Regions:
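Acyl-donor (CoA/ACP) binding surface of acyl/acetyltransferases
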Residues: 1-27, 59-181
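Conserved GNAT-fold acetyl-CoA-binding loop/helix
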Residues: 28-47
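Juxtamembrane/interface motifs at transmembrane-helix termini
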Residues: 38-43, 51-52, 86-89, 174
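A short helix-loop-beta-strand connector motif used in the catalytic cores of GNAT acetyltransferases and
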Residues: 47-58, 68
Length: 181
């Protein structure tokens, strides 16, 4: 478990998949900025079994209540992250801390020089989360995906290892820092 001040990140176990399915099938949880389609538990189980380097985490309040999820996956020679929280828990700093924990974790444990994240250009809350964690906006990827009847743009954000410098939440002793290539 990755421990923060407000939230912890717990590895998703197969027994957690029904919760992810329920969230993924809830249009209010997915929100207005993400693609929405119904997900079957059997499909989630197949993704879970074939995840490879991808890791999924539950975002949990300190009392153990799961309030969202996030994950990381390899994208070319870097890591990409994604995250979602239940609506009533947004705007309380939980997402910001979860992203910062993930950034610390990835730079402490993975031999990478870059972490990236995509968000909708109108999703100002998600952009603030990324900027608080040290990400910089790189630009807009025009018409990058089809969702809800239209092609949508994506805002690309990234943080480089030399911009990160040191962990903000996880302790330095959490892991030996690997040198980037």
């Amino acid at each position: 478990m990755l421990k923060g001040h407000k939230v912890n990140l717990a590895i998703v176990e197969k027994t957690d998949l029904p919760v992810l399915k329920d969230w993924g099938n809830d249009v209010d949880f997915v929100g207005e900025f993400e693609p929405f389609s119904q997900v079957a538990l059997s499909d989630l189980e197949k993704q879970y079994d074939a995840r490879g380097d991808t890791q999924w985490f539950l975002v949990q309040k300190k009392n153990g209540t799961s309030i969202g999820y996030m994950g990381h996956f390899k994208s070319k020679d870097c890591m990409a992250i994604g995250y979602m929280l239940v609506g009533k828990e947004r705007g309380k700093g939980y997402g910001s801390e979860a992203v910062q924990i993930m950034v610390d974790y990835l730079f402490l444990h993975k031999d990478i020089v870059r972490i990236q994240a995509e968000t909708h250009p109108d999703n100002k809350a998600s952009q603030r989360i990324l900027e608080k964690a040290g990400f910089s906006k790189e630009g807009i990827i025009r018409r990058s995906f089809f969702s809800r009847g239209a092609y949508r743009d994506t805002a690309m954000y990234s943080i480089l290892r030399d911009e990160w410098k040191q962990p903000r939440i996880l302790p330095l002793g959490h892991a030996a820092r690997k040198k980037a290539p």
